Amino acid sequence: MKNLFYSFVSGSEYLVLVALDTEGCVYYASAGELNSQASMVELMEKDFLKAPEFRVNSLNSASSSLVNKKSEVKIKDTLEKFKSLIDFENKDEKIPYKVVFGTPLQRKVWDYLVNELPVGSISTYQKIAQHLGMPNSSRAIGNCVGANRIAVVIPCHRVIGSSGKITGYRYGTNIKKTILQNELGSKYGSTITN
């Protein structure tokens, strides 16, 4: 069984629960309102029921035998990068991650998001479906995007409806709007329809 450790990273406008290994590699990240820690932990625990090969421990209560000094440095470095990313200090911050959830199609969609949607860009479910050779599968693509378990790092927030409106987001459309406003800057108003 592999041990993972979770901690919260507070941004100026929202909170992220990050689960990572002793090398600082992220396996899970969920976003939530600033006062939603308990519900975020509950959701994470529910999600990890589907991955019994992992044991997720609170970083604050982790035994010193599980996290040594070298690991502490790596974990702290990744959490600081996450803080920089969600506070919009470094929109291009590269954070190591490993996908442990998802079907082959979901992983294909997530790879597309990571590789084809850089900071400052957006796409629609329909355009992604067309690009992946599935032109009549916008809804399936939407389900794949919504199944992402590594918020912000895998940029599911950069996918909007064909109408230009912000559509569903596992962590709430207000958080999606906040992230997009900060990533797009002055382009937000001309790109997103309310």
UniProtKB/Swiss-Prot annotation:
Q: Which reaction does it catalyse?
A: a 6-O-methyl-2'-deoxyguanosine in DNA + L-cysteinyl-[protein] = S-methyl-L-cysteinyl-[protein] + a 2'-deoxyguanosine in DNA; a 4-O-methyl-thymidine in DNA + L-cysteinyl-[protein] = a thymidine in DNA + S-methyl-L-cysteinyl-[protein]
Subcellular location as annotated: Nucleus
Answer yes or no on keyword Transmembrane helix. no
Tell me which domain of life the UniProt entry assigns to the organism this sequence originates from.
Eukaryota
Which Gene Ontology MF annotations are present?
A: DNA binding; methylated-DNA-[protein]-cysteine S-methyltransferase activity
Which residues are the active-site ones?
Answer: 156 (nucleophile)
Cited InterPro entries: MethylDNA_cys_MeTrfase_AS (IPR001497), MethylDNA_cys_MeTrfase_DNA-bd (IPR014048), MethylDNA_cys_MeTrfase_DNAb (IPR036217), WH-like_DNA-bd_sf (IPR036388)
Q: What class of enzyme is it?
A: transferase
**PROSITE patterns for this protein:** MGMT (PS00374)
Membrane-spanning segments: none
GO CC annotation terms, alphabetical? nucleus
Q: Mainly resides where? A: nucleus
Query: What Gene3D superfamilies does this protein map onto?
Result: Winged helix-like DNA-binding domain superfamily/Winged helix DNA-binding domain
- Name the residues that bind DNA: 125, 139, 162
Q: Which Pfam families match?
A: DNA_binding_1 (PF01035)
Query: SUPFAM superfamilies of this UniProt entry?
Result: Methylated DNA-protein cysteine methyltransferase, C-terminal domain
Q: What else is noted?
A: This enzyme catalyzes only one turnover and therefore is not strictly catalytic. According to one definition, an enzyme is a biocatalyst that acts repeatedly and over many reaction cycles.
Q: Any idea what job this protein has?
A: Involved in the cellular defense against the biological effects of O6-methylguanine (O6-MeG) and O4-methylthymine (O4-MeT) in DNA. Repairs the methylated nucleobase in DNA by stoichiometrically transferring the methyl group to a cysteine residue in the enzyme. This is a suicide reaction: the enzyme is irreversibly inactivated.
Indicate what this protein is called per its UniProt record. Methylated-DNA--protein-cysteine methyltransferase
